[in-house]
């Protein structure tokens, strides 16, 4: 046999935007671009810096550190497929004063942040990735590809990745290779 003529496309599931043209196709054209992560941290840090915790002003380094934590929380809510709607409601009104500070932080990312992102015509990177993967699932369910699709090494820990794995398993040439399974002899 001869030499291979073309290498397979092997994108990483975490970098959905990186392989848009060949894999995701036109689904991403309707979505706003992902906001730069550093810009998001800096915008949130500015919002946080105007706050006080326990009556003390938040310093710029503290604001940046807290903005990173808020971004992580925002990403985790998006990755889980959950909604932030009820998160602030878990804090009872009759708890200690410091819970009010926590509620202020939650208000920044769940009430003020969506408006800021909309004004800038961008969306959170994790949310965009989840929507792109969902669009790819819809596309493959309606028009299964004629070529093999293999997902290797993913545990499906994120809801969007799990949905993609289920879609790939239903494809005529879809395969999932789970990480860490011992080699088993065929009999």
Predicted regions located by residue number:
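Basic/charged alpha-beta structural segments of nucleotide/phosphate-handling enzymes
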Residues: 2-144, 159, 166, 180-186
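Histidine-anchored nucleotide/phosphate-binding helix
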Residues: 157-173
